[in-house]
A protein has these predicted regions:
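Non-catalytic interaction/Regulatory regions outside core domains
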Residues: 2-125
Length: 125
């Protein structure tokens, strides 16, 4: 469903190519993360259209949406723990830290309001 560059060794390898959403999972929010992943799956066209790659962060490891552990190193600028999700823009900067529950419309509206995304939408017409 999501394209994933398995050659990446660091989140910065996605810079200028993809936006990244990281869902932080702890023993206290498993249901929220599961719900968020299901929402993403049912909105795959919205996710893909915006060049979003989704990861889950659990026990200091980034996992793909298929649940496979990656060797990708998490940026030191990201929090070690968080009860929510983080959006990283194509420029590599943190664009949002939002608590659960995850709302796809909130995410897509935020992305669509960004200058880079507006430029992408104009060039895709």
């Amino acid at each position: 469903m999501y394209s994933l560059n398995i050659e990446a060794q660091d989140l910065s390898d996605y810079k200028w190519k993809n936006r990244i959403v990281i869902f932080y999972e702890t023993e206290n929010n498993i249901a929220e993360v599961k719900s968020a992943l299901e929402i993403n799956e049912s909105n795959a066209s919205k996710i893909n259209e915006r060049d979003i790659i989704v990861f889950t962060y659990k026990d200091s490891v980034l996992y793909t949406t298929e649940g496979k552990a990656t060797e990708i190193k998490k940026s030191s600028t990201l929090p070690k723990s968080f009860n929510g999700y983080i959006l990283i823009g194509k420029d590599g900067g943190i664009k949002a830290k939002s608590p659960y529950p995850f709302k796809i419309q909130q995410l897509t509206d935020l992305i669509d309001s960004m200058p880079m995304r507006r430029s992408e939408m104009k060039s895709n017409k």
